Amino acid sequence: MKKIILSVFVLVLTIVLTSCGADEKTIVVGATPSPHAEILNSDAVKNYIESKGYKLEVKVYQDYVTPNKALNDGGIDANYFQHIPYLETEVAEKNYDIVAACQVHNEPLNLYGLDEKTSWDNTKVYIINDASNVERAFKLLVANGLIDSYSVEDFNAQRPEYTSSIGVTIECIDAGLLHNKVSEGGYAVIPGNYALTAWGATKASEYKIFGESTDVAYPNIIAVRTSDVDSDKIKVLIEALSQPEVKKFIEDNYGPTVNYVFKDLK
């Protein structure tokens, strides 16, 4: 009986230790579908990570809220979906202990529509309703003459403050709903990843009317827990994303919709 109990104990201990070892060699990254998860799942990234003795697991999220919570709570090792202003807002509001480890690419914010208008008078334009992106949308609309001025102090998505001498009206809605307005014949300022997920790179380019310049667009980052920023896992992940094969993958698959701008931020 003692031998049986001992054998069972040894078996359980072996399973536990094996599981721990596997976890130490598995890098779990949360990402939104396109282009983030697609980039991570590319051979360019996965082959490099495997060459260093690690395995990459990508968890796909459909929203902007869950990935930071999962990271802060320890459910994933890193996430890839956001830019630094959004991360800073999340950290300030929710007291998350997470930081940017590297920047990878940017996605210029663009105005999309099925047809380009000859006059924007009295047009309704839909924009994203989160505070970190709404100013980008306003700046884009000012630069192209649709609105004259705006204010983002004490931003309220229900009552955005702006003026337009040509009667343009603005409505703030969830990012995931913006592409529907375009499909219905309307106009919307949409983050690049949502446009890619909705239409793919080719259609997104066709529907684009105007957009940010690449030097204005905010870089999308890899975020990690502060305590893990110098861990071996994160070092390998950053190294993988810095490879020239990743740059080529982005250029080949997304064209001007996504721009490779890698920089180590540690």
Question: Positions of the model-derived regions?
Answer:
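A bilobed periplasmic-binding-protein/Venus flytrap-type ligand-binding module shared by bacterial periplasmic
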Residues: 108-118, 218-231
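Short, polar/charged alpha-helical segment
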Residues: 34-57
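Ligand-binding clefts/hinges and TM-proximal coupling segments of bilobed small-molecule sensing domains
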Residues: 132-156, 162, 235-266
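Short helix-initiation/N-cap motifs at beta->coil->alpha
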Residues: 58-69, 153-180
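A conserved helix-loop-strand patch within extracytoplasmic ligand-binding domains
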Residues: 98-147, 247-248
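Ligand-binding "clamshell"
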Residues: 89-101, 114-116, 184, 189, ...
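C-terminal motif of bacterial Sec signal peptides marking the signal peptidase cleavage site
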Residues: 15-19
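Short, well-ordered beta-strand elements
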Residues: 23-34, 54-60, 123-125
